[in-house]
């Protein structure tokens, strides 16, 4: 309790020193402060190699909503391919390619103890940053940059897009007083009318309005883009898969399809392949995907941009001008 109070004081008094991404963005107010405690994960009698900075397996304990959880992590040994190389250019435009050792990296996958359906994708380079699922709920975790503190912020992924679900009561405040701020550029702030104690009905910009510098189109008050969806599934190191990955959705089998009819997977038409299974990239030139018994899990979200002037509606990539 004292630690939580100190963090609150730091946030109030030293806002520029506590400069985590979520605080800098100002989009997340509803988060929980936790202090992950590392627990040895080495088998009894095992010896950690001295030259190895990042262990092959780690465990962390912390609480989520007052409930103790144990996060099991294993180094993702497939994160880098065997022929991994880095290329950069010198000041005189010479191409320089190196093959740095990548065995001792800091990228992990894992799960929550006693939750068979849980998953986790974590970067442990500087604190714990990434995501984990607990009882079907996706949480993001990242360190709060407070000097000499192990404080981390945990918040639900849904809160990234739903900053303020509980609007302030107007209580007959002066007309024009903001009672519900816009949660994204696709949302509209609501203001007290001066005639009612209730905040007006939540409204948002029209579906199909360009957002995030034309990377997406507004859909029901949000701006769904594939990059954010990959972040939620696989953590901060994920990006959108290459176009060739989405060709798999034309198979119409296993996990690669656009929709199901009577539990039979229906292949995507060539123009709809980016409205089926979502493909992300963690390792260069690889196709990463996820799935579950939930038919919508791991699929491209409705309203997502699937091409210039096109959005995904009912698993079809259609013209945004006629979609809504």
From Swiss-Prot:
GO CC, one annotated term: extracellular region
Disulphide-bridged cysteine pairs: 179-199, 186-218, 192-199, 211-223, 230-280, 245-287, 258-268, 275-312, 306-317
Notes on how activity is controlled: Activity may be regulated by the intramolecular thiol-disulfide exchange or disulfide bond switching.
Family listed: Belongs to the venom metalloproteinase (M12B) family. P-III subfamily. P-IIIe sub-subfamily.
Propeptide residue interval(s): 21-173
Protein name: Disintegrin-like/cysteine-rich protein MPIII-3
Signal sequence, renumbered to the chain: 1-20
Posttranslational mods: N-glycosylated. Exists in at least six differently N-glycosylated forms. The glycans likely have a stabilizing purpose.
Binding site for Ca(2+): 187, 190, 202-203
